[in-house]
């Protein structure tokens, strides 16, 4: 873990051409639920449109990395490290020249857990772009040309809360391995308690808060949300619901839902399940090509821009640097 962290800090300290002379900024894309389909051509029009627009954004604005927020391969994950879906749904789709040297940092969703998550982890040794070192892990970065630091905690919310059957039950019922769930939560608590970074993000597949089809994840509202508040986390990033949402609680924690990489769902059926005033933005138009979130972190603030795959900017918000204790 320490070596992994060190390499990331070194990588993002390099000056990229589009960063010279501008405000020092760490830039990345967050996209979830982009995982194509299990039959030919193994991708959807929305996934292709998102890939093309992400390529354009990276070429024009730059990105140090891409966060994959789970459900990387619909509907049943992959079976082995040599599964053709890696090529057909990932490599051949996110193929723009601007994306060839941009690393992906990956976590698993509920559909990935139907297959072999260990194979997705092992694929890190095959692809120069795909980075998935373990089911849950920490990323640490520095904003280029500064000492301003960023930590991202990548979670496996399926092992934390259990799998969910999209067709039978909208809530994960219980983790399959209670000991592994406890280990992951203890790991997160320990690291958040010690986190000194200027920005701290947590990412997982299931949402804490959502007004859409799946609604708030009860397990995360109980176990994770209090930690986000207690330790001054900047934002929680997720997917699972197939739309774009931004919510913010009374403590200033942001909730960035970016699950529109492959499907779009207009549902707002859980609007009354979210506390009044939390929802700031929701977009799930059925005729949309989907979209993603683009994040820029400067020494002063973090900006989240929701972008449609058509190229339209939908919503923008800002979150401040963490207050020092």
Curated annotation (Swiss-Prot):
GO cellular component, one term: lysosome
Catalysed transformations (reactions): a phosphate monoester + H2O = an alcohol + phosphate
GO biological process: bone resorption
Enzyme Commission code: 3.1.3.2
Record keywords: Disulfide bond, Glycoprotein, Hydrolase, Iron, Lysosome, Signal
Residues glycosylated per entry: 116, 147
GO-annotated molecular function: acid phosphatase activity; ferric iron binding; ferrous iron binding
Cofactor requirements of the protein: Fe cation
Coiled-coil region(s): none
Leader peptide range in chain numbering: 1-21
Regions crossing the membrane: none
Cofactor: how and how many bound: Binds 2 iron ions.
Localization per record: Lysosome
Domain of life the protein comes from: Eukaryota
Broad class of enzyme this protein falls into: hydrolase
InterPro entries: Acid_PPase, Calcineurin-like_PHP_ApaH, Metallo-depent_PP-like, Metallophosphoesterase_PAP
Subunit structure as annotated in this protein's UniProt entry: Exists either as monomer or, after proteolytic processing, as a dimer of two chains linked by disulfide bond(s).
Protein name in UniProt: Tartrate-resistant acid phosphatase type 5
Upper lineage: Eukaryota, Metazoa, Chordata, Craniata, Vertebrata
Gene name for this UniProt entry: ACP5
